[in-house]
Swiss-Prot record:
GO biological process: response to oxidative stress; vasodilation
E.C. designation(s): 1.10.3.1, 1.11.1.-
Pfam families from the UniProt entry: An_peroxidase
Catalytic activity: 2 catechol + O2 = 2 1,2-benzoquinone + 2 H2O
Binding annotation for Ca(2+): D111, T187, F189, D191, S193
Keyword entries, A-Z: Calcium, Disulfide bond, Glycoprotein, Heme, Iron, Metal-binding, Oxidoreductase, Peroxidase, Secreted, Signal, Vasoactive, Vasodilator
Protein name: Salivary peroxidase/catechol oxidase
SUPFAM superfamilies: Heme-dependent peroxidases
Site-annotated residues for Transition state stabilizer: R251
Species assigned in the record: Anopheles albimanus (New world malaria mosquito)
Sequence positions that bind heme b: H353
Main subcellular location: secreted
Signal peptide range: 1-21
First-level EC class: oxidoreductase
Amino acid sequence: MWMFLKLLLFVCSSWWSCAQASNCNATSPYRTLDGTCNNLQNPNWGAANTAYGRLIAADYGDGVKSPRKAASGADLPSARLLSMKLFGDEHVLEPAFTLLSMQFGQLVAHDMGFTSGSTDILPCCSEGKPVSNPVPRCYPIPVASDDPVMGSAGVQCLDFLRTITDCDADPSSCSNSKKAEQLNIATSFIDLSVVYGNSVEENTPIREFTGGLMKVETRDGSDWPPRNPNASTACVQRSPEDACYLTGDARANISPQMAILHILFLREHNRIAKQLAALHPEWNDEKLFQEARRINIAQYQQIVFYEWLPSFLPLPDNGGKRSLSSVLDHQYRADVNPTTLNSNAHAAFRYFHSAILGHLHLDYENRTKAGEISFTDHTLNPAILEAPCKYAQLSRGMATQSMGRIDLNIDHELKHNLFKFNAPFGNDLRAIDIQRARDHGLPSYNSFREKCGLPKAASFDDFTSLLHSPQDAARLASVYASVDDVELTVAGLFEKHIPGTQVGATFRCILLEQFHRTRVGDRFFFETSDPIVGFSREQFKQLRKANIARLLCDNTPKLEGMQSKAFAAIDAGSNKVLPCSSLPAVDLDPWK
């Protein structure tokens, strides 16, 4: 029997009842938890529990909501078949970047999107066989009898549930053949909703309501998120004592390294709140909480846009419609909708899945290897973090170990053993990505090429100049009947990388469009000059110093040093490990 994570999801029972501009406080310097009222003219733009955005209208099999079909009207090839025929599972590393770069990217992706219903437990397959009377949302992934890994085990299908759409939530809103739109239960903003939650209801259980602090539990001298009251269903525990955390995002427990980043920004919030309390003893809990949250988010935004994003989408602009210079636009525009794009969340931004590794290193302070753990052995069980020395060792390992190369491989553990636990077989992350894009009606690769102002392919021969190797066009032709069947999620990974970047032209177009909207459409973005929501000149100068290396140092006991560019590989010359005290730090004196 498959085991899946039962997560606590808050989905507004009346998500379609829009916030009104008249209910927004235009003079508040603080963003709401659910993202409403960021845009005062369109208060629901970017808010939690609203539909993902679109660059191109959905392409459904029935024109309304059924998964995308081939141009002929037939079903597209099995997502598992494509995973096996087109993608390898070789262990290829990207020596220029650390695993921290991949993991931080996953945190950002979670911050901007949480697909509604994606973690529900409604089995479509039982022991690898289709269930009788499946629920309507079932869309299992077929597995061929000659599958070289799962076929011998008699596996016929892999579990997959369709995303909840606006039509599911409110059928009356989808009359007259309106296309269904999938719901995002996270805010679309770069706002640390993964730490603070996407609603007051999610935030309340994780706040201390004293001194502006987030709730923590102290064990062995370190602060940890509170234990999840539903640990037996939220995590896969080996014993009732295993740590399972309650955070602003239920996916914090997915892996130890994801949990580390959640804990990092949780501890940073409390570190800031304590400093502000010392500077302003007259401030009450709410003021301290909101100011600490505001600073924490600003530091995070500085890191995302100026330290992390340039590592895979660097200047200069060598193609596509958006350059990074346009992403780093300093002025808010009320006419820009920041809503997370479906094609970004469920295709372009998933390119990072190639960089995930199946084994995670633990490192000593001198960066020699202390050991390693299996990703699948610790999926949904971050308990190892509280074992002696392991939190610091895994943090060092994450900032030292090379991430996987962005290529046509995906780690064996994620391709065959995802969520395996004690079962004889697991799921396939690449197949899930392909199936999810179909579920969401993402149009063809050719359609997105055209949208991005790039040449379309009229024949498979036209793919030759676009892809990694001349043989790749033939590989696509062997599984797709038409060039217009080729999927964005698949071909985007086959594209030649633009020199100096980690992506091809089509994914780059989508990613840059998304981050442009995310930045320019956020009224509270930390660079704004708006006197109501912006920072003073002296405060802003300090926020510019924020960097991931110093945050790791300040919030990781027993960590004594870090390279200044922690997303990049350690280099004895230009990026050597430095004492934590020598790394730039944000000084809160301007907040006096």
